[in-house]
Amino acid sequence: MEIEPQPDGITCGPTCLHALYRFHGLRVPLAQVIDSVQPLEEGGTLEVLLANDALARGFDATIYTFNLNLFDPTWFAEPDVDIAAKLRARAARKRGKKFGVAVEAYCEFLGRGGELKFTDLTRAQLRGLLRRGAPVIAGLNVTYLYRHARVSGPHDDPDDVHGESCGHFVVLTGYNRDDRTIAVADPYVPNPVAEEQLYWVHIDRVIGAILLGVMTYDASLLILERES
């Protein structure tokens, strides 16, 4: 799995998306992907905004979400629930620009034919997704993944007392059953885990980091396939 270093502190998402495009045979410059993915006003992006870019390029996109800030578990209990309508109804009662962007992006995602799933994130599920052979973009809490101090200020300086945890995108590329580790392709380099961009992390830590991504509107997995 090849992944380029992210050019700055806020382009981890497009850099991961670029790696998946390259894996699936789409050759496009990283700068073009960065320009085409919708950013958030405060920097960074959302997994669903990555998915919308992929849908616009002719991919099939599936998001596994664990984000209870946006979704209610009961919406997935029956097959005929209009999730877009539920999201808009929630947006009418809940303020926040980031929330509004997320709602509109998910409505676009569903309208374009994107598939949204809500499941239990278990070892078996994650292993099963990786055994398909295609890489998976994970939106997660990188403070938990790195076991690094929280950060504060415009330069994300370490601040264990006053800081906040951070969201991040990485690509999950494989599983080692002998030591139960996940292969991670990380666009952020250097990082506190390894000197290289490709490293292995125990599956339980990866699962914890994904679920804690709910703190930063992440907590999701994105899988792309080329349309047949």
Question: What kind of feature is each model-predicted range?
Answer:
Residues V28, F118-L121, V201:
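Short coil/turn linker and secondary-structure boundary residues
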Residues L55-E164:
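Predominantly the structural core of cysteine protease catalytic domains
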Residues P29-Q32, L49, K98, Q125, ...:
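Exposed alpha-helical structural elements
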Residues T45, L49, L121, G167, ...:
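Short, well-structured alpha-helical interface segments that form or flank functional binding sites
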Residues M1-F71, F76:
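Active-site nucleophile-adjacent alpha helix/oxyanion-hole segment immediately C-terminal to the catalytic cysteine
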Residues G128-I137, N141-S228:
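Noncatalytic regulatory segments and standalone regulatory/sensor domains
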Residues P5-C12, V81-I83, H162, R180:
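Short, mixed-charge, low-aromatic patches
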